[in-house]
Amino acid sequence: MTHSAPSNPTQLPSDKFLRTADVRKAFIDFFVSKQHTHVPSSSLVPYNDPTLLFTNAGMNQFKDCFLGIDKRDYTRAVTSQKCVRAGGKHNDLDNVGYTARHHTFFEMLGNFSFGDYFKKSAIAYAWEFLTSKQWLGLDADKLYVTIYESDDEAFDIWHQDIGLAAERIIRIGDNKGAPYASDNFWAMGDTGPCGPCSEVFYDHGEHVEGGLPGTPEEDGDRYIEVWNCVFMQFNRQPDGTMEPLPAPSVDTGMGLERISAILQGVHSNYEIDLFVNLINSAADIIGIKNDNQASLKVVADHIRAVSFLIADGVLPSNEGRGYVLRRIIRRAVRHGNKLGAEDSFFYKMVAPLVKEMGDAYPQLVEKQAFIEKAIEKEEVQFAKTLAQGLRLLDSELESLKSGDVLSGEAAFKLYDTYGFPVDLTADITRERGIGIDEAGFDEQMNIQRQRARDAGKFDVDYSAAIKVETPTEFVGYEQLDEKEVNIIGLYQDGKEVEVLNEGDEGVIVLDRTPFYAEGGGQVGEMGEIRTSSGVFNVEDTKKSGQAFIHHGVVNMGSLQKSQTADAQVVSAIRSASARNHSATHLLHAALRKVLGDSVSQKGSLVSSEMLRFDFSYDNAVSQKDLATIERLVNEQIQANVETHIELMNIDDAMAKGAAALFGEKYGETVRVLTMGTTEIEDGIQKPFSIELCGGLHVKRTGDIGLFKITSESGIAAGIRRIEALTGMGALRYIQQADSQLTALANQLKAKRPEVADRVQTMADKQRELEKQIERLNQKIASAQAATLVDNVQTIADKKVLIAQVAGIDGKAMRGLIDDIKSKLQDTIIILVGEKDGQLALAASVSKSLTGDIKAGDIIRHLADELEGKGGGKPDYAQGGAPSSDKLTGVMQALPNWVASQLS
């Protein structure tokens, strides 16, 4: 962070062409010279705020500062914040590429005051930066401002202190159907900090359509909002009354792209230097001329959102943030395809982006290769279904005309089978003036979700139906039992009851409990709750709000509300769960050391039997790396170092390098777990593992006993999973593997160290036999080729060979085609082979004929008819399908189909 004025602040004379990078630097320099602390942009994944999908405003990272929860060592801040608006409440995706100012990614310049200066200084700073010849030097006669209708204080500052004519100050009242609901009144929520705001507008001139703010023509493009200054001065109460805040604050925002467009004398954000360079790069990479196509703007915009999201730890997936990222990538790929891109191209846009923005955001430079790899992998995956999906969509649209609607069933099939996000389908149909039945799509989606829920039902989410206002005090960190706790609630079938009798299944809520509730990946604990009249077996513990929900069965007698009880956790299960939980922390640290800091936790499951850890990584982890990871964890266990738990302020924890799980909600005070030996990095002592965690752990690393990885697999694109055992479970696994190795050695009549070599020898022999079989198949194919050439027919003046061949698989088919081609010139060859219940499809078209018909189209036709898959190049293509009763009819109809294609 920068705390003092820059030694060489950027000077920006008004007649100079300004690069976007210059504007960003000038803004920061200006406010640092006004004693603001330069705070770096926060991640696009909102830290400590699961209510947000993405960071979408400069104030997101300061939310707790405005609420008075987060006390920092500065009261003035300036930022250039990365923002994404795609998915969720704030979604600009559909408009990107078609308007002058919509983006998925943008930068928000902002200055903030936390109980320091207020309206007078905020307005003065904004005006100075915008109009001073030392800074941006905008023509003051082109600026208008809006204020909240009753904000006389802001009016007086603009009119009397700044000298703005009264007719240039526009009052905007409540225009959203409720008191204090206005374009010029900002609120954090239904209750809490809020206040009036004042916006600065720039007049692009009479040649652009549009009216002043507050007029019926305000949606035009003539008057463009440049800067918004929010004055948080009230605290809205639940009854709607406004109480003055003891320390009013300021939150401002100015879009970097918008102000750059004004300074560079262009109307569209896509005409500023940054976008011009990206658009030109997109045209060069795709191999087309830049004719200002909307699709080029889409590609240039989307590479920013995609690259920064991946740099901040988001990877393509089918849910949450990962699915929004996937939608953006696939939209860009489709627009590139529309422009003529035939191969993967989008990942090549990362390099031009790094050139434009790498200086301001070094993380782009550091993670360039990782970003490119992640994008390319998603491109390749989507390419497998893009062409098929587009053909299906084209066939659905053939019978529709402008103004019609594509059925929800068709849109859902494109989504479910071909990976087309519904907004991508809408993007394509909109180009033809056709809408989408979104309600029908949602209905199909709900049906699928219900099927998934029905298939996965094995238990009742009993905590969801129980709402308890009174929080439970957890006392289990240092003890397994607690005497004389109070039963404050009994529930059966989700309803509160006064008594649970023997055999009843139900839920007990206590005022204090030693039972750990499911959280942080660790399962809830088991044990018993005993009163003078009965015993309740606790089978699981969860949370409902701040209350702990103990689910189980009355084993003996009965329990009543308001009774006192003794609560006891099963010791052996607690110890085993603690071992596995601590091992996940050591595993996480080892993964980052071996695979790199880009690895981040995506989920975990910790039970008494095993542990499961999901993490971001693009490839399968090699056996060598797995062995290293396993060794590192066991070295920490062997070191038998004491674990340390400390409560501290969350900012202090982050400063120490503590890892946090994105999406988790943490309070101001957090529990920090430090494990393992201390190492020296960059001259600083750092523990092997340091994480925020509220779970149960061992006292010393040696208590884990032993760590053994049992599997590593992929569960989604870019997400890997490791399963492992600890303690006696790990020992039993190793002993079982040892026994299996001994049995295998006996079967092979070899010594144990010789088993691998003996198996390799057998595998080599099998491969040689398979090669011999393949050579025999090729001989059979060659023999068939000699007879097949006699079956050539003439269709539309072209030589065509259509034939079925027996006992030929896909591997042998290529050799057979080559043999036939050596005997026939300028011929279309279509062969279908059948072997072991599978059909092998192949087509070859002489290069002289590919202008008339393409091999890929032939195979796609056959694959569609026979419910198979396939594709390829214009001169050669292959495919496959299951054996089918349809084959005879398809082959009989094939000459007529070929004729229709050649006519």
UniProtKB/Swiss-Prot annotation:
GO terms for biological process: alanyl-tRNA aminoacylation; negative regulation of DNA-templated transcription. Belongs to the class-II aminoacyl-tRNA synthetase family. Zn(2+) binds at H581, H585, C693, H697. Binds 1 zinc ion per subunit. HAMAP family: Ala_tRNA_synth_B. Its EC number is 6.1.1.7. This is Alanine--tRNA ligase. GO terms for molecular function: alanine-tRNA ligase activity; aminoacyl-tRNA deacylase activity; ATP binding; tRNA binding; zinc ion binding. It catalyses: tRNA(Ala) + L-alanine + ATP = L-alanyl-tRNA(Ala) + AMP + diphosphate. Pfam families: DHHA1, tRNA-synt_2c, tRNA_SAD.
